[in-house]
Amino acid sequence: TMPWGDLWEGTGDLFSRKWVWLIGLLIPAALLMVVRSKLKTRIDEMNKDVGYLRRDSQAHTPLSLLYTFLIAAPVPLFLVLLAAGLWVQPGTFTSVMGAAVAQIALLWLVFEVLYRLLKTNGIAQRHFRWSMEYNHQMRRRLLVTGLALIPLTFLVAFGDQWPAQLSNDRLGLVIMMASMITIMVSLPWVAQSYPGRHYSRTMRTLATALCILAPLTLIVLTGVGYYYTSVRLTGHMIYSLYLIALWIV
């Protein structure tokens, strides 16, 4: 059974005895929240400048991307600070949950950035000339994929920090199968929605096939008893998705 009591005790100790330290660490996240509206306004202004000779510049796109990362950063930054606090608490379970919360922070940052890039009249549409229809399709399908990845990040954290617990983790096995099936359905549609004008139909087909085969392989491994192996490989798959998203941007 999971020692939930240790988690609540460690979290309570973190907030009761180290609240001054937490407040100090939360100042950067609060500052980012304060300047979000100004950053959004600046991004909108630069989006309108794109395509106009006298107002456009080579710095517009990298600055817009940087501002988007800063806008998306407050919640992930808070989660990272919470994860660091849990990590230093005594007990294996609190350390595992700290690692899991850190994984959630990275997931949140990546998908919020992508979601903001793909909004109507956003950076993808104005700077990269992606069509609004493709952007809307990708946003919907990325949302499904991101939600399916949330429980998987917890499983990966347990596999990294507390592998012995996976041997009796029946609930985790069911969650693993359900999440992988969801990803196997949603991720290929994301690949199909990508408006890669410079990619041939063969490359698009290969990318779609890979998006199907990767989760399908993990489903098969889980089904035949290699649960720990599939959890470890899931971590590599998630990190690969992050790198692909960064490469696309």
Stretches found by the model and what they are:
Residues 2-18:
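Short, aromatic-rich amphipathic segments at membrane interfaces
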Residues 13-249:
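Hydrophobic/aromatic interaction determinants used to assemble and anchor large protein complexes
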